[in-house]
């Protein structure tokens, strides 16, 4: 059984790693089944923070303006993760955002890969009768203290949830699904699996785009809620198109 891993949780501006950004990273390092270290950082995303995300997480635009940028935090997070197995609740969500940010900063090594453990996947297999398998609801079901929608709190709760699920279903074979499996089958279900997410590095904003965007911002007296210098080529194109649509050419 896996006793050494790092639990990861990311808060983001939305659900799509292609367009959205990380605003908070939380990670918990586990060795021999015990938490030995923690990582938590807000991240300045360089784009506007949707109001619904503030309502969900309690994180404000003002806090993020004071936070470190992705170019500082992502290298620190990768160092913390090392080559560990990554535990998450819907682990591919967090892994996809992490890898996109790392690839765009040329931080992802060609040979780099991780195995993953997913408490959402396990709960779907062993707790099909529950009306919801969101992390908050599973924590309520098992009496686990939980600070919802903050990265470190979610990561810590995921560690506790994984421990409970492993003991209840893998070790003790409780419940209908587990009772129908052999010990070997249960251990295989709880074994880490390869995390595979393919992404290409996005090109940075072109000088012509930068010049055009600064000109449009000045012309229409727009105060940007993003960092022009850190935009990708695609992001700059979408913003320029949006300005043209709003103000005309």
Regions found by a protein language model. Name each.
Residues 1-115, 128-149, 175, 186-189:
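Conserved non-catalytic scaffold segment of RNase H-like nuclease domains
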Residues 152-163:
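Acidic, divalent-metal-coordinating active-site segment for phosphoryl/phosphodiester hydrolysis
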Residues 161-249:
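Acidic two-metal-ion nuclease catalytic site recognized across multiple nuclease folds
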Residues 72, 156-157, 235:
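Short secondary-structure boundary/hinge segments and terminal tails
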Residues 125:
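Nuclease catalytic cores that cleave nucleic-acid phosphodiester bonds
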Residues 12-14, 121, 157:
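Short, glycine/acidic-enriched loop or turn micro-motifs at the edges of active sites
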């Amino acid at each position: 059984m896996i006793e050494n891993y790092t639990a990861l949780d990311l808060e983001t501006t939305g659900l799509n790693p292609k367009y959205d950004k990380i605003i908070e990273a939380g990670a918990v390092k586990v060795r021999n089944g015990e938490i030995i270290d923690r990582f938590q950082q807000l991240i300045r995303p360089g784009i506007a923070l949707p109001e619904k995300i503030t309502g969900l997480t309690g994180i404000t635009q003002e806090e993020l303006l004071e936070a470190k940028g992705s170019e500082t935090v992502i290298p620190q997070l990768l160092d913390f993760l090392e080559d560990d197995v990554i535990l998450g609740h819907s682990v591919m969500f967090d892994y996809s955002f992490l890898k996109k940010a790392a690839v765009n900063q040329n931080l992802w090594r060609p040979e780099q890969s991780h195995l993953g453990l997913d408490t959402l996947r396990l709960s779907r297999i062993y707790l099909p009768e529950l009306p919801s398998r969101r992390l908050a609801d599973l924590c309520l079901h098992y009496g686990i203290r939980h600070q919802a929608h903050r990265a470190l709190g979610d990561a810590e709760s995921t560690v506790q949830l994984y421990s409970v699920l492993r003991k209840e279903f893998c070790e003790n074979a409780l419940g209908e699904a587990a009772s129908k499996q052999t010990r070997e089958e249960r251990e295989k279900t709880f074994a880490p699996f390869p995390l595979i997410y393919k992404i290409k590095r996005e090109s940075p904003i072109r000088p012509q785009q930068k010049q055009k965007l600064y000109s449009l911002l000045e012309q229409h007296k727009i105060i940007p809620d993003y960092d022009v210098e850190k935009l990708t080529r695609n992001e700059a194109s979408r913003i320029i198109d949006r300005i043209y649509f709003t103000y005309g050419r």
